[in-house]
């Protein structure tokens, strides 16, 4: 059974396009019914980021959950990993994050977490999809059994304390000037406060959300503003989160971007030296640079690859017994601490290495020279452009031209109508030409 609503990271789409109040109401009802197990009073934690449509989706979901007898705990704007953590710590049956992650404000989405704070399995999502398409009038709660909703205070402090506990008690960030870009998103209150409490000299940007400016020319997908601010303030490091703070990109003191592959290399080597890796290896996706794989091999560590999506990274980590994994895009999963990607906690692990080494970030965070990698996106209006004969021919020709000295990865995005074309190899000019040829063919097929 193919999935109708769920993509690789929950349900996501244009606000009042795919993501309507009606859909949010039905998702609340369907998920509420799916997670009502046993006779106890059931409850759900709902968080959101700062986009304008969050209010609309939040209230519709409250109506859905309460209509099937589930109590709702509202925590307001909070990072996705904080919602996952709170779901578990507050003994809730379900967690919801209303966010479209790194997308602009026009989009929104619904991410669901089980009682242990993990994203739902494909099977559970399919069960919810079946309920979405079934009439549930006869399964609504009786008047006396309707759910209640309340806003919870103090949740910011809970997450701040959780994040601080991932560092040794004797480690302070004193002496570090840190510019942090919260993308005008969910972390705009908690992360600057946590850094200040840890002793850093904090310069916050992207902390003035207005409902429209989330991820707009800021955050992990647009680190240019952060790079400029780091140089301007002569800071030691810059931290760029995305709209829901489940991914992170760093900037060194020179303003150069440090991607998720380099972060994985830093943490992997540090944890190996400290004996903290549960297995001699880490998990990453097919998008991670071959340079990372070669670096890890030199450290005696394996790299296990998965399809794109942090959920698949986590599944492999759990099944294989790994405690470190992530994506080049900055989703870093540290399963000793969190059940999902946590951009801030990942940044803290790197800051710990910087403090211990007393070396510049540009030295600490450059563990390998990445192979030239070209990634381009082709937006389409539907259909199957990858099945076009000219596209297939361009891909086949490209693979022959790389001839074992590089690789191609062409895939449809699981979160938006985009086909991603990635080429990697030792000859940058050749890789660019191969990718451009495929992108041109896709553009004509998608027109």
Curated annotation (Swiss-Prot):
GO BP terms in the entry: carbohydrate metabolic process; peptidoglycan biosynthetic process; UDP-N-acetylglucosamine biosynthetic process
Record note on cofactor: Binds 1 Mg(2+) ion per subunit.
Residues annotated as catalytic: 101
PTM per Swiss-Prot/TrEMBL: Activated by phosphorylation.
Residue numbers of Phosphoserine PTMs: 101
Database matches in InterPro entries: A-D-PHexomutase_a/b/a-I, A-D-PHexomutase_a/b/a-I/II/III, A-D-PHexomutase_a/b/a-II, A-D-PHexomutase_a/b/a-III, A-D-PHexomutase_C, A-D-PHexomutase_C_sf, Alpha-D-phosphohexomutase_SF, GlmM_bact
Enzyme class: isomerase
Keywords assigned: Isomerase, Magnesium, Metal-binding, Phosphoprotein
GO cellular component: cytosol
Family: Belongs to the phosphohexose mutase family.
Name assigned to this protein: Phosphoglucosamine mutase
Source taxonomy: Bacteria, Pseudomonadati, Pseudomonadota, Alphaproteobacteria, Hyphomicrobiales
